[in-house]
């Protein structure tokens, strides 16, 4: 439908969860097409859509810096796509490790409730082994920062407009 009235800028991304996803443009309006699964939508919003909205608004958006965590699981994955695995951060002796939520399906809302964050597995990795380190993004820090920055941006940019409109 978008191709008939506008242009598809991209569709299909080499990520999991988060497929299918598309970005199009109709006249001067961007159209973001999201998958129907809740985990996919939540992660896409936090990691891709939110920064894109900031970019369109001319604001800077900085993703929180990940920390390195060793994984406490073995797993095979397809290469040529990045995967975000929901994990629980646990203390193991003197270090923290990442335990994978058992079911990683993109419809598993419980995986978000159980998890503390996500581990990002790069495209080139096909085997994940216990003890390997990967980038870990903490949900609490990440989502707090996303919503704090959004609210701060809205207050700075909308509050003067609202105040000035009431004076008229």
Residue ranges and their predicted role:
Residues 162-167:
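Short, intrinsically disordered C-terminal tails of secreted or membrane-associated proteins
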Residues 1-142:
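Flexible glycine/proline-rich
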Residues 12, 159-160:
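Helix-centric, low-specificity signal for extended rod-like, repetitive segments
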Residues 143-159:
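Hydrophobic alpha-helical signal peptides and transmembrane signal-/tail-anchor segments
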């Amino acid at each position: 439908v978008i191709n008939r009235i506008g242009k598809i800028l991209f569709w299909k991304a080499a990520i999991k969860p988060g497929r299918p996803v598309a970005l199009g443009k109709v006249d001067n309006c961007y159209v973001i097409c999201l998958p129907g699964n809740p985990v996919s939508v939540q992660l896409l919003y936090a990691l891709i859509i939110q920064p894109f909205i900031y970019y369109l608004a001319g604001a800077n958006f900085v993703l929180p810096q990940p920390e390195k965590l060793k994984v406490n699981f073995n797993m095979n994955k397809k290469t040529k796509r990045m995967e975000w695995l929901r994990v629980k951060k646990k203390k193991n002796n003197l270090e923290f490790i990442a335990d994978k939520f058992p079911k990683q399906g993109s419809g598993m809302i419980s995986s978000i409730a159980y998890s503390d964050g996500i581990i990002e597995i790069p495209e080139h990795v096909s085997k994940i082994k216990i003890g390997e380190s990967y980038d870990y993004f903490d949900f609490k820090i990440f989502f707090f920062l996303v919503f704090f920055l959004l609210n701060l941006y809205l207050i700075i940019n909308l509050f003067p407009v609202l105040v000035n409109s009431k004076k008229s």
